[in-house]
Amino acid sequence: MALTKSFLESRSTGELFALADELGLCLPEDLNRRLVIGEILDCYHSALDLNPPCAPQSLESKGTSCAYNTTEIHILARDPLWFFVFWDIHEQLFCTLTQSPQFRSFFLRVHSLGGHGWHTSLDHFDIDVPLKDRKRYVHLSLADDANRIDLCCKMLQRERILAQSRVVTLQRSVIERSLNPEDPTGAEVLSLCGLPLLEETYPSTSLPVCS
C-alpha cells in the first residue's frame, strides 16, 4: 500500500510529526499541518525514486494469505529451552520504515524478566533478522524464569519497539536445580531439551544463543 495524501490527512498531527521523524525530517513544531503532509509526501516520493517499491509482505501463496497485515509478534514454547517466534509487520508501516534513509534493520530483543509481575527486564540480547524473515527459533537460558520478545526497528539514531509478545513463564531455574545427568529422569529431560546435541555440534564453552 502506497503512502497517500488521503491516508496522511486521516492521521493526527502527532502521528504526522512522528512519521516525519521516522523519515529523517526535522520540521518545526508550529509548521502548518498541510505543509507537514507535503514534506512527508515529497520525502516518500524521493525515496521511491532512489529505491524500487518494496515487495508485498503478506507472504501470499496462490491467493491464500499467510498473514493478517498487522504488526504483532507471538511466542510458542516448543519446550523449556526453545521458543518458536513468529511475527508480521503491517505492509504500509514496512514500506515507510524500510524506505526511510534512517532505516538500518529489524531485530528481535529477547528479555529475561524478573520483579513483581515480571515487569522488569533483568537482561536481554538482540537477534538481527532479514527483511523477509517472519519466524525464528530462539534458544533460552536455564537461568531464566520468564521471557518476553520485542519486535524492534533500528533507525540511524534510535530504536523503536514495533510490537511486544506476551510474557512466557516456565520457571527454568527449578529445572536446572533438579537435573542430575546420572539420574535416568534427568538424562531424559536433558536429551529432550537438545543440550547434548548442541554440545556435540558446538564443543566450545560458549554455545550459540539461537539457531
Swiss-Prot record:
Pfam families: DUF4912. InterPro entries: DUF4912. It comes from the Bacteria. This is Uncharacterized protein TP_0359. It comes from Treponema pallidum (strain Nichols).
